[in-house]
């Protein structure tokens, strides 16, 4: 039996709440803190006590419950050093290349600026888990609020270097809309069309599309496929850089 358990649920409208629990120590981390009540309900349902919040970035829909949960549990909040002044209750700052321990599980910090200037993702290499928040979604990526397309492409390239069997938990349930857009960019991709049909069925039943895997995203997510000749030809960008192709795809999604 694996030492780590995860509990996945919705917060607010479409934010994912994720609890990461170590059976041996009893430690429990919330990946971001979008909303207090759903997190408390999940903790009560599982019989867990919250010990950590791992904050990925400063947006309000990811830090809204930091202060109230810290007051209730006396927990430790870890977050990106480049956004520390914007993260309520932060205790420990981390940056790219840092490694820290969560209940005996190594956690690597990957800085992924683009959505925000200091956004980080948390990678647990031994457990094959990535918490990508608003950098990488199933069939999508985050909007560029504080970064350029070049910066975001570099961030996504960092994530693409992870093993294909890495399970990815992302910040929002946007997958159905992402699938509708992805088909317009990559219409001949049979793996994408098959996946889109599965997503339609999953969402019609009220199911969640998280987690995904890095291998699946590399095969079907147009934002990771800027180097694909078919996509480049469809966009008329055969000689453009990968970053420029990515920028065009991001622009089209913004206007979709």
Curated annotation (Swiss-Prot):
SUPFAM superfamilies the record matches: Metallo-hydrolase/oxidoreductase (SSF56281)
Enzymatic class: hydrolase
Reaction catalyzed: an S-(2-hydroxyacyl)glutathione + H2O = a 2-hydroxy carboxylate + glutathione + H(+)
Positions contributing to Zn(2+) 1 binding: 57, 59, 115, 134
Gene3D superfamilies per record: Ribonuclease Z/Hydroxyacylglutathione hydrolase-like (3.60.15.10)
Cofactor note: Binds 2 Zn(2+) ions per subunit.
SMART domains: Lactamase_B
Superkingdom classification of source: Bacteria
Molecular function per GO: hydroxyacylglutathione hydrolase activity; metal ion binding
Coiled coil spans: none
Protein residues bound to Zn(2+) 2: 61-62, 134, 172
EC number, as in UniProt: 3.1.2.6
UniProt-listed GO biological process terms: methylglyoxal catabolic process to D-lactate via S-lactoyl-glutathione
Pathway membership: Secondary metabolite metabolism; methylglyoxal degradation; (R)-lactate from methylglyoxal: step 2/2
Cofactor names: Zn(2+)
A family per Pfam: HAGH_C
Keywords for this protein: Hydrolase, Metal-binding, Zinc
HAMAP family assigned: Glyoxalase_2 (MF_01374)
Family stated for the protein in its record: Belongs to the metallo-beta-lactamase superfamily. Glyoxalase II family.
Quaternary organization: Monomer.
Protein name: Hydroxyacylglutathione hydrolase
Organism: Rhizobium meliloti (strain 1021)
